[in-house]
């Protein structure tokens, strides 16, 4: 049984989230709280496996509460966020401070304003997945004043004797879901502005979140990071984030690769889809590509990666121990597709090395 505490200042959302969670017989809501102070007291006394946390609350807001949890009694926290630019920015900050994931809070105080069945299934799956992961790999304390340690790929890596010639590969495709934003931030922030490849990212995320995500990455990285637009050219030292609710493809216009932002296939389980991205990169770039699958639930990316690998692409999967949820990378490893399985701390360096393989 997975034990959960729900923290939200809205009685409606406390009730709604509790109803969603208790649809699953393997989840028990052991307490609710209307603000961060009450939430901290109940967390200390009841010791849940997972907490859902609203961001905007009186007395003590969600991010301040999260910082205390991760400093004093680390456990998986799933943020509940409004679908606004401000909500997106606060959520991305919460993920950086240790939250494992988030679910959107739709406007309106009626169950009709939500796709309750889909939200319930998604939330219950996330709760059980992060609880199971925390039991195998307990979360570490994150001090409130901690500065992230960055081990950048040095500029001279690309001018050393082993890498002085033009790299063989110049397109990096990344597929990622649960736990992705801080993981992607870590990888991209370690790359130099002279990085000799273009990076395409399919991060499972709502449409309201992807532009703030790209802007936040751009402010923290030496390379440029942008939300992708249809027709963007491929350039070294730039990372493109696929807009939420759309797909990112790489297509050849004559001999030149060009980004396509499209709605089809509409039947894809996820939008953005790692499968769509990987398949298009494999077909258009073949041996010039590196595919990277990072933390996330499910198996999105595995079919597209089969195409990429069959066309000569190099495949990297994130290690189980460094994932928030070991689903998407596990599918790559179990499918025999991974050329390397790499801890998060080493992905930037291994991606840089893969350009020359």
From Swiss-Prot:
Q: Does the keyword Cytoplasm apply?
A: yes
What reaction(s) does this enzyme catalyze? Answer: [protein]-L-glutamate 5-O-methyl ester + H2O = L-glutamyl-[protein] + methanol + H(+); L-glutaminyl-[protein] + H2O = L-glutamyl-[protein] + NH4(+)
What CDD domains does the entry give? CheB_Rec, REC_CheB-like
GO cellular component, as recorded: cytoplasm
In Pfam terms, one family for this protein is Response_reg
Any single GO BP term: chemotaxis
Q: What is its EC number?
A: 3.1.1.61, 3.5.1.44
- Name the major location: cytoplasm
Task: Determine if Iron is one of this entry's keywords.
Answer: no
* Active site residues per record: 177, 204, 300
Alphabetically, the GO molecular function entries are: phosphorelay response regulator activity; protein-glutamate methylesterase activity; protein-glutamine glutaminase activity
Q: Where is the CheB-type methylesterase domain?
A: 165-357
The UniProt PTM text for this protein says: Phosphorylated by CheA. Phosphorylation of the N-terminal regulatory domain activates the methylesterase activity.
Subcellular localization is given as: Cytoplasm
Keywords (A to Z) from UniProt: Chemotaxis, Cytoplasm, Hydrolase, Phosphoprotein
As stated in the Swiss-Prot or TrEMBL entry, residues carrying the post-translational modification 4-aspartylphosphate are: 54
Tell me the ranges covered by the Response regulatory domain, including all copies: 3-120
Member of which family?
Belongs to the CheB family.
Task: Give a short account of what the protein does.
Answer: Involved in chemotaxis. Part of a chemotaxis signal transduction system that modulates chemotaxis in response to various stimuli. Catalyzes the demethylation of specific methylglutamate residues introduced into the chemoreceptors (methyl-accepting chemotaxis proteins or MCP) by CheR. Also mediates the irreversible deamidation of specific glutamine residues to glutamic acid.
- Domain comment, as recorded: Contains a C-terminal catalytic domain, and an N-terminal region which modulates catalytic activity.
Q: What is this protein called?
A: Protein-glutamate methylesterase/protein-glutamine glutaminase
Q: Which gene is transcribed and translated to give this protein?
A: cheB
